[in-house]
Amino acid sequence: MKTSKKRPAKNKLPQDLATFRDRYVELFGMLPALPAARFEFSGDINPEFLALSERLRAHAFYSDVFDVKITQLILFGMLLVEHHPAAQMHAIAARRAGASWEELHKVAELASVTGSLAPANQGSAILKDVRDKESSV
């Protein structure tokens, strides 16, 4: 039988991890399912890794460069381009941080243009390269 170091009681997180968890509730108005599972499981199995990953997240999400609204708009667009379901949670967080429907829609417009023009840009570059090689022989 494998023994492991003593862990905190289930759902009892150290204060630093509880503070990180509470930031999700501030942003989203709730603790989303994926972070909730991460806090429960990683908090039990490897709280050090959870703390490291949450410090990395906090460093990126909360800065003196972008305010919370802009950060959430950027994350919404990035996740939208990736077709990631978490885009919805970041749209909610952006609204809670003061984003207008127009701002969110503009981000969706930018994401759709980025996604649809990428094949046109790449295709044109490939075809130009092929044409240039053909004309040089």
Segments from the language model and where they lie:
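Helix N-cap / loop-to-helix initiation motif
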Residues: 66-67, 98-102
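Amphipathic, charged-and-aliphatic alpha-helical interface segments
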Residues: 70-85
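Short alpha-helical "patches" and their helix-cap loops
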Residues: 87-100, 126-137
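N-terminal alpha-helical segment
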Residues: 53, 70-71, 87, 104
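Beta-strand segments within the central parallel beta-sheet cores of soluble alpha/beta enzyme folds
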Residues: 105-109
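Acidic-glycine-rich active-site phosphate/pyrophosphate-binding loop
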Residues: 45-55, 85-97
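Acidic, glycine/proline-rich low-complexity segments that act as flexible tails and inter-domain linkers
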Residues: 1-70, 122-137
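Substrate/cofactor-recognition hotspot
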Residues: 117
